């Protein structure tokens, strides 16, 4: 069969248009597929805890977390989370680099300045649950949070790269995972205003410290698997108070939580009734 030049050109043009339409159709199909649940309500693509964890250099994570803290003012939760998942995205691509990282900005100031959980701790702990379920994450969070309660921080020092205040900062153990207590105690003991650059710098460095520790925990978890255990014992106050207040069947079993009891219930000057005869 003889094919003329005109027929050949028309045929190629038709193939090109057809191929483009097929490509458009596949893009639309993918978009439609992404808009739908994996198989039904509450399911997700890849399954729960379906992402693969990768080892990271804790020192690199710390620096990225510190820089992330200052990035657009997104703060501690963003910096800590990005230092793990964002770095995996930079090194390994999808799905890590597809996460909407800016949503972690909500954790700034203990979640929109409410002073609840330290945003750096939340950002770091949230990364664990991308890879492992509750039972496996529990000892990982215990390790991170109990470390934070008892360790004198900040350890990280950015040197001349400091974005708030250069030089050493006072170090202390917060005894609490709550932003309100951690910040207030440090500011009170060191006579530093909570709205100061020094306080912001401390939080930036704490973000780096939390990221460093979280990366260490993830690396160890990858090596040890289900054998991973927290190296920190239960706090003495939780063990003692829990005998009554966290024991099933006890009339006083109305307390929930395993954070250190003493910062809120020790009866110190800071925990007395401040609404009576307050100046």
From Swiss-Prot:
This is Split-Soret cytochrome c. Its cofactor is heme c; [2Fe-2S] cluster. Heme c 1 binds at residues 241, 244-245, 274, 278. [2Fe-2S] cluster binds at residues 76, 118, 179, 203. The lineage of its organism: Bacteria, Pseudomonadati, Thermodesulfobacteriota, Desulfovibrionia, Desulfovibrionales. One of its GO terms (biological process) is anaerobic respiration. Homodimer; linked through the 4 hemes that are shared between the subunits. Residues 1-32 form the signal peptide. InterPro entries: CGCAxxGCC_motif (IPR010181), Multihaem_cyt_sf (IPR036280), TAT_signal (IPR006311). It comes from the Bacteria. The N-terminal Gly is blocked by a labile group with a mass of 85 Da. Binds 2 heme c groups per subunit. Each heme is also bound by the other subunit. Binds 1 iron-sulfur cluster per subunit, probably [2Fe-2S] cluster. Pfam families: C_GCAxxG_C_C. Diheme cytochrome c which may be involved in sulfate reduction. Keywords: 2Fe-2S, Electron transport, Heme, Iron, Iron-sulfur, Metal-binding, Signal, Sulfate respiration, Transport. GO terms for molecular function: 2 iron, 2 sulfur cluster binding; metal ion binding. The modification Blocked amino end (Gly) is found at residue 33. It comes from Desulfovibrio desulfuricans (strain ATCC 27774 / DSM 6949 / MB). Heme c 2 binds at residues 180, 261, 264-265.
């Amino acid at each position: 069969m003889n094919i003329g030049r005109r027929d050949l050109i028309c045929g190629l043009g038709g193939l090109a248009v057809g191929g483009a339409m097929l490509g458009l159709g596949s893009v639309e199909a993918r978009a439609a597929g992404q808009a739908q649940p994996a198989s039904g309500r509450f399911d997700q693509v890849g399954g729960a805890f379906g992402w693969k964890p990768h080892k990271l250099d804790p020192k690199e994570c710390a620096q990225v977390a510190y820089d992330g803290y200052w990035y657009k003012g997104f703060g501690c939760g963003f910096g800590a989370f990005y230092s793990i998942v964002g770095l995996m995205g930079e090194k390994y691509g999808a799905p890590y680099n597809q996460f909407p990282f800016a949503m972690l900005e909500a954790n700034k100031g203990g979640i929109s300045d409410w002073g609840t959980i330290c945003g750096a701790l939340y950002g770091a702990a949230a990364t664990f649950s991308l890879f492992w379920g509750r039972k496996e994450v529990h000892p990982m969070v215990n390790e991170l949070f109990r470390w934070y309660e008892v360790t004198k921080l900040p350890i990280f020092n950015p040197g001349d790269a400091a974005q708030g205040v250069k030089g050493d900062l006072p170090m202390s153990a917060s005894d609490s995972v709550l932003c309100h207590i951690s910040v207030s105690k440090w500011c009170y003991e060191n006579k530093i205003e909570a709205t100061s650059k020094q306080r912001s710098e401390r939080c930036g460095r704490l973000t780096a410290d939390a990221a460093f520790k979280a990366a260490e925990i993830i690396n160890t978890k990858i090596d040890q698997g289900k054998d991973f255990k927290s190296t920190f014992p239960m706090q003495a106050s939780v063990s003692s108070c829990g005998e009554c207040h966290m024991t099933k069947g006890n009339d006083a079993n109305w307390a929930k939580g395993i954070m250190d009891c003493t910062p809120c219930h020790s009866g110190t000057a800071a925990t007395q009734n401040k609404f009576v005869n307050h100046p």
